[in-house]
Every structure is written in C-alpha cells, then in structure tokens.
C-alpha cells in the first residue's frame, strides 16, 4: 500500500507531466484562460489517462515475447496500439460530453479531440511501458498523472484569470505573461524533485 501511495504522490507532484516533463503544453497553455474550462479539460485528461494507462498495460502485456505465441515478440507494435487505444477512449469521451455536457464540449472545442495526440497522454503510457508497471501500478500512475496535469492547468488558469486585472507590460500581455507564470510554476514544482519516495 505504501508503494502505491508513494507512486501516486510521485506522479502528481514530483513527476508532474506539465511542469516537470513539459508534456501536453499546447493544450496546457491554450485552455488555461478560464478555470471552469481548465477544470473540464483536466477531468477529461484524468479520465483518458486513468483508463488508457491500465488498458495499454494489459495490451502491452499481450505484445511481449511469448505472451500469445512462444517465440513471437510483438513489442514493435506498441506505439500503434497505444495510439489506437488512446484514440478510442478520447472518441468515447467526446461522444459522452457532446451528449451529456454540451456546454463543456463547446467550450473545449478543437482541444478535446487533440487529447488524442496530447503528448502527456502518450508520455504517461510510454513511461508505464518503459518502467514496466504492473496493472495496479498503472492504474495509480495513470490517475495520479492525470490529477497532476489537472492541478497544474487549473492553477495556471487561476493565475491567468487574476493576471487579466494586472498591469502587465504591453509586450507581455496574453501568452507572454502566461509563459512566465508557467515557468515560475515549473520552478516551484522542481522543489519536489529532491523528495525521495
């Protein structure tokens, strides 16, 4: 149990996808203008990561040498299968949001289908395969990585909303000051890197 708790804390804070590995930055910066939209996208990322990492772990275990047929190694198919599973889960999420939460679906716009090619999603799945997590570890890691990404984007959206009323220099208004805020947040999250769990 302690191992899973440390893996969860590590995936949320120490190895934060957005602020430590700088993965998923296109949607991270583009959708961080309003807290409500950032929260909705964060929940969507938690859903996709929380499902795609464990599902891809099961698929990857079938691709390993001798898993299906003795002497047959299908690990060269891992990237294409990972992308297929992620795309299917994002499509299911998109249909669900369109049907039941149309306001969030419209607010996310093009960024919802872009979760399919979000490097934070693929990065978490690749880390799972590289680190050879078992199914339980992949569930904890996927949920923790999604929660960490959501924490980062909601925090940045809150800062961005407050900065609308600040007197920023003309050349830094908009994306410029957002980059500076994201960089300062990343520096703050680097303080967690010295923690050994």
Swiss-Prot record:
The UniProt keywords, alphabetically, are: Cell inner membrane, Cell membrane, Ion transport, Membrane, NAD, Sodium, Sodium transport, Translocase, Transmembrane, Transmembrane helix, Transport, Ubiquinone
Question: Care to name a GO molecular-function term for this sequence?
Answer: oxidoreductase activity, acting on NAD(P)H, quinone or similar compound as acceptor
Ion transport as UniProt keyword: yes
Where is the chain membrane-spanning? Answer: 11-31, 35-55, 76-96, 108-128, 139-159, 175-195
EC number assigned by the record = 7.2.1.1
Which reactions fall under this protein's catalytic activity?
a ubiquinone + n Na(+)(in) + NADH + H(+) = a ubiquinol + n Na(+)(out) + NAD(+)
KW Repeat (keyword) present:
no
**Coiled-coil ranges from the UniProt annotation:** none
Q: Which GO terms describe its cellular component?
A: Gram-negative-bacterium-type cell wall; plasma membrane
Q: What is the protein's given name?
A: Na(+)-translocating NADH-quinone reductase subunit E
Q: Can you state the subunit structure given in the record?
A: Composed of six subunits; NqrA, NqrB, NqrC, NqrD, NqrE and NqrF.
Cellular localization per UniProt: Cell inner membrane
Give the UniProt record's GO annotations in the biological process aspect.
respiratory electron transport chain; sodium ion transport
Q: Which HAMAP family match?
A: NqrE
Family of the protein in this entry: Belongs to the NqrDE/RnfAE family.
Name any one Pfam family assigned in the record. Rnf-Nqr
**Described function:** NQR complex catalyzes the reduction of ubiquinone-1 to ubiquinol by two successive reactions, coupled with the transport of Na(+) ions from the cytoplasm to the periplasm. NqrA to NqrE are probably involved in the second step, the conversion of ubisemiquinone to ubiquinol.
Please report the record's description of how this protein sits within the membrane. Multi-pass membrane protein
Q: Which PANTHER family match?
A: INTEGRAL MEMBRANE PROTEIN OF SOXR-REDUCING COMPLEX (PTHR30335), NA(+)-TRANSLOCATING NADH-QUINONE REDUCTASE SUBUNIT E (PTHR30335:SF1)
Q: What is its main location?
A: membrane
């Amino acid at each position: 149990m302690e191992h899973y708790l440390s893996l969860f804390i590590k995936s949320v804070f120490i190895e934060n996808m957005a602020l430590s590995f700088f993965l998923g930055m296109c949607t991270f910066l583009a959708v961080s203008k309003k807290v409500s939209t950032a929260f909705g996208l964060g929940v969507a990322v938690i859903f996709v990561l929380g499902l795609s990492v464990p599902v891809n772990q099961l698929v990857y275990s079938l691709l390993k040498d001798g898993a299906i047929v003795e002497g047959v190694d299908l690990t060269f198919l891992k990237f294409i299968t990972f992308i297929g599973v992620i795309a299917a889960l994002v499509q299911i999420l998109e249909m669900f949001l369109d049907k039941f939460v149309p306001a969030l679906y419209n607010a996310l716009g093009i960024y919802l289908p872009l979760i399919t090619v979000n490097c934070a999603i693929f990065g978490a799945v690749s880390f799972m395969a590289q680190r050879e997590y078992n199914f339980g570890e992949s569930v904890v890691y996927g949920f923790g990585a999604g929660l960490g990404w959501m924490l980062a984007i909601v925090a940045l959206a809150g800062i961005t909303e407050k900065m609308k009323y600040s007197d920023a220099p003309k050349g830094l208004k908009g994306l410029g000051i957002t980059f500076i805020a994201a960089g300062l947040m990343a520096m703050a999250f680097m303080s967690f890197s010295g923690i050994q769990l």
